Amino acid sequence: MDVMKGTTTVGLICDDAVILATDKRASLGNLVADKEAKKLYKIDDYIAMTIAGSVGDAQAIVRLLIAEAKLYKMRTGRNIPPLACATLLSNILHSSRMFPFLTQIIIGGYDLLEGAKLFSLDPLGGMNEEKTFTATGSGSPIAYGVLEAGYDRDMSVEEGIKLALNALKSAMERDTFSGNGISLAVITKDGVKIFEDEEIEKILDSMKAKPKKKTTKRSRRKSK
């Protein structure tokens, strides 16, 4: 079953935080159907998720998880733990395996007792807890290459953000079904922060600025 119809989404863990990033292009065959598609959602105070695949199926899952998270908080007075949220979604997807939701999901969250958590789920309910990083969608092979080359478990949040953005940028340059901007979220013990477009542009601009190379005596002789 091929569910990678378009999109690139990435998630990674660094410095006791989770970083999620997605592109904004929605495709209908070879047509760019939407240039501002929302693929990054806040589920609870400490949980966010990305979607790839069928838009209708993914949006139905988002609505369901938001409702379940609210019910959990009403009943217990606590936020739903990331593992419980991912397990709930895994059960929902598996129960619909005969008529599956055509979507791939990344769930990132912060557990106040266990720290940063990252999960990937397939359309049939298969769930993996990721200890480093993950990617979904048609641009994921390209994103994985960037993540593999640049990932360090001890990197700072700022370095993790730049790595996630680099992975998205590379995928958007090579995958025709990914593009039209980036959505970004960071999840820490302080909760979910979804970045504004202006904030993302500022980070991207800072990444373009390259430090000037020092001129050595040898290079000065060559230039004469």
Swiss-Prot record:
GO biological process: proteasomal protein catabolic process; proteasome-mediated ubiquitin-dependent protein catabolic process
Keywords: Autocatalytic cleavage, Cytoplasm, Hydrolase, Protease, Proteasome, Threonine protease, Zymogen
A GO term, aspect molecular function: endopeptidase activity
A single cellular component GO annotation: proteasome core complex, beta-subunit complex
Residues in coiled coil: none
A Pfam family that the UniProt record links to this protein: Proteasome
Domain of life: Archaea
Subcellular location per the Swiss-Prot or TrEMBL entry: Cytoplasm
E.C. numbers: 3.4.25.1
InterPro entries cross-referenced by the UniProt entry: Ntn_hydrolases_N, Pept_T1A_Psome_bsu_arc, Pept_T1A_subB, Proteasome_bsu_CS, Proteasome_sua/b, Proteasome_suB-type
Reaction catalysed by this enzyme: Cleavage of peptide bonds with very broad specificity
Activity regulation description: The formation of the proteasomal ATPase PAN-20S proteasome complex, via the docking of the C-termini of PAN into the intersubunit pockets in the alpha-rings, triggers opening of the gate for substrate entry. Interconversion between the open-gate and close-gate conformations leads to a dynamic regulation of the 20S proteasome proteolysis activity.
Entry annotation: catalytic residues: 7
The protein's enzyme class: hydrolase
Residue ranges of the propeptide: 1-6
Assembly information from the UniProt record: The 20S proteasome core is composed of 14 alpha and 14 beta subunits that assemble into four stacked heptameric rings, resulting in a barrel-shaped structure. The two inner rings, each composed of seven catalytic beta subunits, are sandwiched by two outer rings, each composed of seven alpha subunits. The catalytic chamber with the active sites is on the inside of the barrel. Has a gated structure, the ends of the cylinder being occluded by the N-termini of the alpha-subunits. Is capped at one or both ends by the proteasome regulatory ATPase, PAN.
Function as written in the Swiss-Prot or TrEMBL entry: Component of the proteasome core, a large protease complex with broad specificity involved in protein degradation. The M.jannaschii proteasome is able to cleave oligopeptides after Glu, Asp, Tyr, Phe, Trp, slightly after Arg, but not after Ala. Thus, displays caspase-like and chymotrypsin-like activities and low level of trypsin-like activity.
Family classification: Belongs to the peptidase T1B family.
Matching PANTHER family: ATP-DEPENDENT PROTEASE SUBUNIT HSLV, METALLOPROTEASE TLDD
Name of this chain's protein: Proteasome subunit beta
Gene: psmB
